[in-house]
């Protein structure tokens, strides 16, 4: 959540696959807080990244452990668009069947 507060514009948006985007830094922080509250452990690893001007693509590996003990592993690509030193748009691409609870 600190990363969202520090590195995202006030009007930033995040979008999961083809779902409607969430808009506004406060909304993004609240969503992240709720998602993390369902987990007992979150492990992420940056596999690779590419930067072209104000656009960044990051390939992530995630391992999420729910409070029930169920573990979910998945790959994700985050596509970021930056405005200066902050992200104003981010979209995530992943197989939703890997993380649906």
State the predicted function of each range:
Residues 43-45, 59, 72-78:
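Short, surface-exposed coil-to-beta transition loops
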Residues 26, 68-71, 99-101:
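A short, polar/proline- and glycine-enriched secondary-structure boundary/capping micro-motif
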Residues 1-53:
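A solvent-exposed, acidic/Ser-Thr-rich amphipathic alpha-helical stretch
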Residues 51-62:
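A short hydrophobic beta-strand element
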Residues 62-64, 82:
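Hydrophobic beta-strand positions in extracellular immunoglobulin-like domains
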Residues 38, 64-73:
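Short, cysteine-centered beta-strand-loop-beta hairpins and adjacent loop/turn segments enriched
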Residues 75-101:
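Short beta-strand edge/turn micro-motifs at domain boundaries
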């Amino acid at each position: 959540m600190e990363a969202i507060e520090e590195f995202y514009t006030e009007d930033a948006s995040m979008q999961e696959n083809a779902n409607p985007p969430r808009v506004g830094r406060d909304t993004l922080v609240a969503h992240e807080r709720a998602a993390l509250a369902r987990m007992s452990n979150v492990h992420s690893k940056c596999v690779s990244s590419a930067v072209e001007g104000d656009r960044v693509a990051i390939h992530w590996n995630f391992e999420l452990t729910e409070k029930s003990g169920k573990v979910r592993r998945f790959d994700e690509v985050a596509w970021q668009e930056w405005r200066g030193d902050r992200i104003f748009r981010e979209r995530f691409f992943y197989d939703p069947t890997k993380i649906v609870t």
